[in-house]
Amino acid sequence: MKKLMMFVAFAAVCFTANAQIDSKVKDVMQKCVKAMENPAGVEYDMDFKVGMGEVSMMSCHVLASSKGNLSKAVVTAKVFGIEAKSETGFDGNEEWEWNHAPSLSADEPAKKDTVFVQKASERKKTPMDLDLDIIEQYRKATMKTDANYYVITLSNPVEQEKALPGEVVIKVYKKNYYLRELSMEQEGATISMTVTNVRTGLADDYFRFDPSHYPDAVVVRK
């Protein structure tokens, strides 16, 4: 289960050259990377789902934004029916992390939220970054097209001991090369990530840390 959750955190794909990968596949992947790293700033809505058979183990909505070195990610997750929220960000000077975990029962007292803030010169990589880099871990990639998407299938992992899925399926929009969907099976569970919306053109102020956004939280500066 730990390996499965690590892969979900890693989840999203990535695209660098591999000698055994067809040039048409590499071209689509490289264009996808360029489209998803808009220098004017890009924000994408993503839905993550992890299930075992017909049982939903985890669902997660992520609103992830980036512009150069600036970043922000707002995550709402539901694990076995329990909802939790978090937000991380870097505004060029400070990085912060806010987590909200609900009480597990009516008898449990409400927990006080905390925002941890510290000075930083550059942002740390977050679990929700679109890391666009997994193709090097696979020996084979095939591609087909339908009316709206390029559908790329990665298979035959290079290193089995890393517990990578045997097959990863990636959908990329034909019209603009935005990533649409990533799906796989891992340790008996089905994992999917779907990008539901992409917005470009973000002001720097959008990434600035503002304590007023967390009125009920304790701000702790490290």
Task: Please describe what each predicted stretch is.
Residues 4-15:
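Sec-dependent N-terminal signal peptides
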Residues 17-69, 142, 212-222:
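N-terminal leader/targeting segments and the immediate start of mature chains
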Residues 24-27, 129-142, 193:
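A short, amphipathic edge element
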Residues 49, 139, 143-221:
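Gly/Pro-enriched, hydrophobic low-complexity segments
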Residues 51-57, 79-82, 158-164:
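Short, cysteine-centered beta-strand-loop-beta hairpins and adjacent loop/turn segments enriched
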Residues 61-68, 89-93, 166-181:
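A short, surface-exposed beta-strand/turn
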Residues 63-125, 189-192:
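An acidic-aromatic
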